[in-house]
Amino acid sequence: MFGAIIKKIVGSKNERELKRMWPVVEKINGLESQVAGLTDDQLREKTFEFKERIARGESLESLLPEAFAVCREGGKRALGMRHFDVQLIGGMVLHQGKIAEMKTGEGKTLVATLPAYLNALTGRGVHVVTVNDYLARRDSEWMGRLYRFLGLTVGVIVHGIDDDERRAAYAADITYGTNNEFGFDYLRDNMKFALEDYVQRPFFFSIVDEVDSILIDEARTPLIISGPTEDSTDKYYIIDRIIPHLKKGEVKEVEANTLSGKRKVYTGDFTVDEKARSSSLTEEGVAKVEKLLKIDNLYDPRHMEILHHVNQALRAHALFRRDVDYVVKDGEVIIVDEFTGRLMPGRRWSDGLHQAIEAKEGVEIENENQTLATITFQNYFRMYEKLSGMTGTADTEAEEFHKIYKLEVTVIPTNRPLLRPDFPDVIYKTEREKFNAVIEEIKGCHEKGQPTLVGTISIEKSEVLAEILRKQGIPHNVLNAKQHEREAEIVAQAGRKGMVTIATNMAGRGTDILLGGNPEGLAKQWRRANPDAPEEEYEKVLAEYRTLCAREHDEVVALGGLHIIGTERHESRRIDNQLRGRSGRQGDPGSSRFYLSLEDDLLRIFGSERVSKIMDFLKIEEGEAITHGMITKAIENAQKKVEAHNFEIRKHLIEYDDVMNKQREVIYTQRREILAGQDIRRHFTQMMDDTIEEISSFAIEKVSAHEWDWQSIGEGILKTYGFQIDIPPQTMDRLSPESFRTLLKEKVHEAFDAKVAAFGDELMDHLIKVIMLQTIDAQWKDHLLSIDHLKEGIGLRGYGQKDPKQEYKKEAYQLFMDMMARIAAETVEKIFWVQIAHEEDVERMEEEQQKQARKKMVFNLVDEDETSEPSKSKKLAGRNEPCPCGSGKKYKKCCGK
């Protein structure tokens, strides 16, 4: 209560933040008339003046009012758009390295230009991150007009461009691109063999558009570059054939003489836990599998891999549904994004799950891949000196943004008041009743001409609805999110009179729905259908569409604006809010309502018992609906439960990945130092000394030298350095571990000096560089596999009363130290044994090494829950197209040689 009184007096934290920024807005507004009086050239000259002032030590904060005023004026002249006062506040929040929550239609794309312009003046590069290539290209071209007008350069990173184009884009003052492209470029750079081949600059400032989607929804999604393993795929078909013989059971609680008075009994051959998305064999199931596969003990260490694949096959059959979790298209299993409903070709579940689903569907099974390089989005974006983001829905996840990314969320007020009423949820007992009600609602809106956007959570549900509408003769558009550009066009016209659009929840995000339609979009469609029409005819058509859309706009406003119908609640409240946010932009009228049933996944798995009891208590008959605050509260509690569970998963992932991140930093730093030629000889000398220490460990203190393990010492010296060491008996009597170490060190350094004299300093340094990189890359790849295996089994340590996280840290560190020792031993051994006839031999060796590395590369996005290594593309590149290996070279000059 005391806290509420204080809050009433001084305002909430968000209100205090906004209050602090209004004086700066007044200052910017005070400069507007002065800046408006400048010519275009004088305005552009301001950019160079700001850069000089920064070079002389002036801070960005002191420049902010002037820079924002110049950017605002540039927007008016280059784009015909003026930044509102609330957009100036949004720009300040982003510049401070925070998240700006701005409602749909408030102009987030334009807001980003303010901090991007200001920070680009440092010359250190600003990255603007979007969710897909279409938006990256669109925003770089659209906002690029403003930046170029003010004298800055703009680049865009999209799939399919080569390294030279990427390098040029990153060298620009402001670079647009997707989170995937930025992340993969980082991994690719750290697999290259020359610093001049790197495309990225050191990370400075990043503005992440749709920050909740990228930093939260995709946080469990590591980026992976992988290569195929050699394992046979027959095992997946064999195991898949036994699954139909297993009977699904359930868990029952029976009376028992235990502390709780109950005991769990498992029936059938396997049980399924939908909440945890897991399945497991019962004792009867284990016995049946052993009989079907003709093995004695499924839990024998030799058969653990079989047990793992049986469990994955069970999950494939019991938990993963066709046209919901994935689709089968052209003989391939393609994952459906649970948040957007988009197909994700190329993405694969990992750990044998994707192969199990391929076996279930009877399509060709692709080999599992082995990780060559990986990073999570969480760790990638935390490398930026300053990180900020914007979205329409961040406040519900404010705690996670703060705990994981140290990012504060500031809610920016809307430019005009929000007029959209969000009607209470309507709940039915069955899905059939719910769909009947949804169809009636759509029909009513369509008949009076009110545009309707219907949100579904899966492709399957959108197709069911579309089929019913088709049978009833109601014209509609269906968005299954297969093509971003087409998707944006359909969404842009969803506000036309009488339009019915069915879309998976997040499809078309980033595109405003204009009431009455978008005349430019309609004219663009006409231009595509009539490419040879003269320009004056196009202008005439555009003018007609503008008149039509203006008339329809007024009619749609009178009808109540865009009506949103949600057909199911998502696990996250934020996704529901995003759907609602498609309506009521910039003070437009609109409305929203969700239709639910007890058969919906969220209610069935997490909350149906309580809701069902309420409905029974209220004696709800079939066909009747209920609208009640208690029900809405129960649904919100179910959503909060799921959100908390998902937050724990993401937190758990980052705690484990932080261990890996430190190791990645060590390896990548060492690689960069080697590529830069920094202290290569010192690195190698340290490696030699490490191997000397290893061999000298056989010389034991307080034991006569005659009793040392001379066989192991001799084998170690011969294997590592290629020579033998003879010690006379009289010297042996006086030998101590320390004097032996000194003697061995002298001999090894003498042999190395002789090698340098024979090869020459320059060739030797080049050789060390090539062999070090080759060895580091090979050992790092194997280390990543070892870490994957460690992660898979570490949870079992909990049964031994040990903390799995601490055990993981300890063992991962030991694996890392073992890898570093192997890198040293292997590098030294190769240098001492290598024979070079000509300098060209080293160059050939380097070329072959690079070619092999490129051939192995497959670029993957992986969902960490089941997660994935996407498959190699089946499409062959043309000889002059960029090589699909990602090298940045043309195919004919790379893998097509």
From Swiss-Prot:
GO cellular component: cell envelope Sec protein transport complex; cytoplasm; plasma membrane
Enzyme class: translocase
Biological role stated in the UniProt entry: Part of the Sec protein translocase complex. Interacts with the SecYEG preprotein conducting channel. Has a central role in coupling the hydrolysis of ATP to the transfer of proteins into and across the cell membrane, serving as an ATP-driven molecular motor driving the stepwise translocation of polypeptide chains across the membrane.
Compartments, as annotated in UniProt: Cell inner membrane; Cytoplasm
Family: Belongs to the SecA family.
Presence of keyword Cell inner membrane: yes
Keyword Nucleotide-binding in annotation: yes
Region (Disordered): 846-897
Catalysed reaction equations from the record: ATP + H2O + cellular proteinSide 1 = ADP + phosphate + cellular proteinSide 2
Cross-referenced InterPro entries: Helicase_ATP-bd, Helicase_C-like, P-loop_NTPase, SEC_C_motif, SecA, SecA_CS, SecA_DEAD, SecA_motor_DEAD
Organism: Geobacter sulfurreducens (strain ATCC 51573 / DSM 12127 / PCA)
Membrane topology listed for this record: Peripheral membrane protein
Enzyme Commission no: 7.4.2.8
The name this protein goes by in its record: Protein translocase subunit SecA
PANTHER family linked to this entry: CHLOROPLAST PROTEIN-TRANSPORTING ATPASE, SECA INNER MEMBRANE COMPONENT OF SEC PROTEIN SECRETION SYSTEM
GO biological process, one term: protein import
Binding positions (Zn(2+)): 883, 885, 894-895
Obligatory cofactor(s): Zn(2+)
Keywords, in A-Z order: ATP-binding, Cell inner membrane, Cell membrane, Cytoplasm, Membrane, Metal-binding, Nucleotide-binding, Protein transport, Translocase, Translocation, Transport, Zinc
Any matching Pfam family: P-loop_SecA
GO molecular function, one term: ATP binding
